[in-house]
Amino acid sequence: MDALPITETTGAEYASNNEGRMHACGHDGHMAMLLGFAQILDEYKNEDPPRLFRRRRFDPLTNALLIFQPAEETTGGARYICEEGVLEKYNVKRIFGFHLWPYIDKSVIATRSGPMMAKSSEINVEIEGRTSHCTAYEEGIDALHIGCQFINKVYNMPEVLPEAPSILKFGKMESGDVRNAISSHTRIEGTLRCLDIETFDLIIAKMNEIADIYNDAYSCSIYVTHTKGYPPVTNNYRLFSKASSIFSDLGFRELEKPSMIADDFAFYQQEVPGLFMYLGTGSGIPLHSADFNFDESILLTGIEAYRRLLKI
């Protein structure tokens, strides 16, 4: 599930057999934890009453929904699960999720209340000018030059970047066909990350204002578009508070600040209260790298954490 287009170099006996495809983000570990938890639930179901649930006396098979969700790495599978009404169908009242995290000590559970991960969106800027020979540059409208100006202007708008952290970076720019002609078209591609929707909307609005100013100044046409992307991951305070208590002996850690990466778990949190957590691998090997791996013993911590979460 969610294999990435990377050739694995771990040398593990369970390494991918498919060239150019590997589990490099821990999603295989996420599945293994849920499968292990499912086995525990299955073992409990015939106990009378189930010892895990003696205090509340409910059948775990009607009160625990395990979601094996694909496509986090692509289109955001959580979005489609929500749109198809899965949470409503099973009367989900709260939701929890883990992600293996190499930058935290082995088996440590880490999370925080409030903003935890960023909203992400792809930004596209199209600039239409007019071509001319470089010796008659005054007859053209230089889309390449305007594109460079646009990037510089956007990068230098501190009034748009308030105290709430945000990242706006352009990583790709295409323009022109030949070296001695004024470019008539430029395309710029980038990414925007914000921890709240208000900051995101503000930055998009300011980019459109800059586009309008340049349209008037250069007689060009600039179009700024963006994808819907993933919402920000924002953890419920009550669930965080309870989790921090029940995980105290498992090596719990409260994160000091949010991360600017994104995860589609945020779609679930738009429907019901949720808590997203990291489970440390302690390896320091980055996600999405060819040598990403983890000690499988940490999965036992994840399974135990899920067991305890059913008591919340």
Give short role names for the model-derived ranges:
Residues L144-I312:
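Metal-dependent amide/peptide-bond hydrolase catalytic core
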Residues I40, E84-G85, I213-Y214:
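A generic secondary-structure signal
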